[in-house]
Amino acid sequence: MNTRMNWQNLLSTQRFRPKNGEIVPTVTPSTQEGADALRTDFHIDYDRVVFSGAFRRLGRKTQVHPLAQHDLTHNRLTHSVEVASVGRSLGNRVGVMLHNGGFLPQGNTPSDIGAVVQVACLAHDLGNPPFGHTGEDALRDWFRRPEHQIYLNTLNEAERNDIQTYEGNAHSLRIVASLEMYPEAGGMRLTAAAIGALLKYPWTTQHPNGRKKFNIYQTELPFIRQVADELGLVSAGADSWARHPLSYLMEAADDICYALLDLEDAVELDLLTDTEVESILSELTFAESAWHASSSRQRCAMLRGIAIGKAIDDVAQTFMLHQSDLLDGTFKGKDLLALCSPQVQNTLAKAKELAQTRIFRHHTKLLTEIATFPCLGSILDLLVPAAYALIAEKQLATRQSLALELLKKHNPILPEDSLYQAYMKILDFVGGMTDNSAAKMAQDLSGVGILC
């Protein structure tokens, strides 16, 4: 059993796929380019995420403001690209420090660290359902209602927990490891290093915190066991591991971006003034730095850029300070930002507090979030009973047969599927929808407007 991680293993470029019931190493044609080719293995990872359908769909998924009409408001796609940019800078900075300290393995460059973090950042939100975190809550709520337990009675505890706890992080892993590119045959077949850096919560729903946050469904557990062994992740119990150190950089990049860029959206939507944003950023910037800005929008953007740069420096220093604990799997901090300078902590805390009081509780946002529950619920009302009728009862009413046709172009439910497999396919389908397509399907299913 590993008691300490090392960078040689943590930067593994090995890829895996299932074969004959086992998870085995694999090499695909594009990974035979070699170390001196135009693309490194980590750049190949990046390209696979960028060209995936799941990544493209993020363009119509909520970041903070559902179905926003404003052209400059962030969605999950723009958020992910910006997080990846910050993550790359963070990784490159740490990579240089690791190299200068003699920690970087021979054959690896500082930019390899940046590329791995960039890939993880780019993929971290692929599994977010329509309407963001409210969509997660709506999917969980439906499967946890007492009247719906009849559909789950024959599932074992781990399977039931998975179905009742839709988790965007776990679905991001499921997309890259099982669904996209090579469906049920290794997914995107990313490098072990990129997969490890993506795991913010490397455990299943069986973990004490698993009903809140987790990264591993039962469907991906055999795959992750093999990846964890390849990376040399420290075991933290049954099917639970200490985090890959680079996952902390991915997490920090995400936190920095959503804390500061949510404020920029709020200014665009007239929910906050630029003066309020400048006040929040004052501890990490100085007003004179943007004195020549020609507009309040440009001024906010310049100050935001300075603040992000300061935060990147601080996080990189904090990472190196705690590198030994991260490699031992004994890091005790909530995250890296919690151990950064008071200036960084205060700025992000104030930004999140302002967002909570002035943005997240705004009337128009609340209305859309309330509507998310009946919207996604109506789709599950149709699909889950149909899947149950096919598999458990072996007979379908006409409406149920029509309902299952909706999944035919995606990942059709088959009579030989288990109920767990069928419900995971339904969650793949609904969770993969954009805000617009989910809203349109719910409206169409209601029959409203069908007659002109």
Located regions from the model:
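Acidic, carboxylate-rich catalytic segments that either coordinate divalent cations
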Residues: 1-28, 32-35, 385, 394-452
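Sequence-structural signature of the catalytic-core scaffold of metal-dependent phosphohydrolases
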Residues: 2-38, 50-61, 81, 85-86, ...
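Acidic, low-complexity proline/glycine-rich segments
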Residues: 44-56, 340-344
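Intrinsically disordered or highly flexible coil/loop and linker segments, enriched in small
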Residues: 55-59, 148, 181-185, 204-208, ...
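A short small-residue
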Residues: 61-71, 354-359
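Amphipathic alpha-helix face/heptad-repeat signature
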Residues: 76-80, 249-252, 304, 308, ...
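C-terminal subdomains that position terminal phosphate/3'-OH groups for nucleotidyl transfer/ligation
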Residues: 285-421, 433, 451
